[in-house]
Amino acid sequence: LSAGIPGLTDDERRQVESKITDIEGEIQPGGNDEDIKLALLAEMMIATASAKLSEKQVEIKSAIYMEVLRDVPAWAMRRALRKWYAGKIAGVAEDQFNWAPSSALLLRACDDELREHREALADLKLLLDVKHIDETIAELESPAKSNQQLRTL
């Protein structure tokens, strides 16, 4: 920050830290997310099935999707699938929406849903790292002074 602009107050810092905690909680899977994601996968397989899958095939496909999507919260997966069903995933050809997305494509769609949260989180963390210019100058000068003092010994 430039001279004359105050840094964050302690109260503002606590508010930013609280918001960071909230966002981190939102973007991490929690509680019953695994059950919800399994239900969403079952819905997806039924809605987009091009052929009848055996129970074993469904089990294997579900395990692959769950492994790929392990770090995705259920709400992001739900939003990504709703966009898939509506044909509104950027960069996907119209005819691809007739089938289930690959696990990689679904992960990309989930990441798209999480992007705004992750960007806000990065911005807030950066805000906490911002120091007043006088403090930065003092820190930069301090090691230089220490090095000079060591050289004179």
Language-model regions, residue ranges each:
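Charged interaction scaffolds used for protein-protein
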Residues: 1-153
